[in-house]
């Protein structure tokens, strides 16, 4: 049964229109956030108003539990939130409460594919797990490890249902106790005691979609449970991605289907769109259309289930595993913030790169014109140096080095946002309404 606070939260979200299908995610950390003097949660608390003002609906927070690695991605004592390098449990709860007070949902970074043990067994292998509570919750032994993870297991568990994670024991998610106790832990994170609303599933390649479905259905996250499924794209002999990436996006769509499809909260990060954009903005914008005239990523097939992004803590930040061309980052945001799908803004770009105002302006255009994850897309131009698209008949956007695309802009549209290599137009009626709102707001001061 929902508590009064939870019911109030749901009502607030409905009033803010978040139930309409439009989500603006914000990744609220990077790879180095754990180093923050005074704690990352406290720093982020001071930025809540800026995040709210930008139209964000969901903030993705780092893994909250004790971890062998400082960033949180090698978790051990899952119930121990005070051992996090990002701050204390009370600081986390205060941050989530502040977000809720502004109508923003909090996404927990859920790392359950693998887990680090506290103690060695009689073989001298680290495979005795401590849950972080005085009782026996999540206190596991080697029989909770997949038997094909021979470095750690005792050979009695089930086979792994997904990809191997070599650095830590792969947990046996077919074990009933594992499923029940991890579900209970997630429900605890979602309860009033902590307050998370939704999930980001780390390394979801490590366990089957059917396993993910167990946790999603067992915890009913509010609005989304977005999976990280980062697989290699198809590359040509020139080292660039092949034009056709249908197999890559099909794997992402298949995962959504297998966790429950439309009826499920399951979603995926659109790594297909990310990979194509990385190359397209370097003078190959013809890549941004598929053979059917649609967007070439997951947003071209199932946009409601796609979370689009420019960079994250892995691809960008200090890891730089797959970075977006740094001089064209705003072209990436002009694309994802005007197109179908559920866009995610990266902390670094918003706060550290000085792009806050430009990104917020694009979000404002999106929200002012009612662009959502399922908006219609008409691609008007896809040349090497220019890409132009119309969204819902209300917004037109352009990215690329070509300056003049005026012949493609329909009559009755007004320039709403622009910067290096991008421009966005909206119908004059929307622009006038926005101006009237600003005028009336100023008059009331």
From Swiss-Prot:
Binds 3 Ca(2+) ions per subunit. Ca(2+) 1 binds at residues 113, 160, 163, 170, 206. Keywords: Calcium, Carbohydrate metabolism, Glycosidase, Hydrolase, Metal-binding, Signal. The record marks 314 as: Transition state stabilizer. The keyword Isomerase does not apply. Its EC number is 3.2.1.1. CDD domains: AmyAc_arch_bac_plant_AmyA. Pfam families: Alpha-amyl_C2 (PF07821), Alpha-amylase (PF00128). It catalyses: Endohydrolysis of (1->4)-alpha-D-glucosidic linkages in polysaccharides containing three or more (1->4)-alpha-linked D-glucose units. Coiled coil: none annotated. Substrate binds at residues 66-68, 73-74, 200-205, 230, 232, 250, 257, 294, 300-302, 313, 319, 398, 403-405, 415-421, 425. Residues 1-21 form the signal peptide. Ca(2+) 3 binds at residues 149, 164-165, 168, 170. Ca(2+) 2 binds at residues 130, 133, 135, 139. One of its GO terms (molecular function) is calcium ion binding. The active site is at residues 202, 228. One of its GO terms (biological process) is starch catabolic process. SUPFAM superfamilies: (Trans)glycosidases, Glycosyl hydrolase domain. Its cofactor is Ca(2+). Binds starch not only at the active site, but also via accessory binding sites on the protein surface that are important for efficient binding to starch granules and thereby increase enzyme activity. Belongs to the glycosyl hydrolase 13 family. Important for breakdown of endosperm starch during germination. Monomer. This is Alpha-amylase isozyme 2A. The gene is AMY2A.
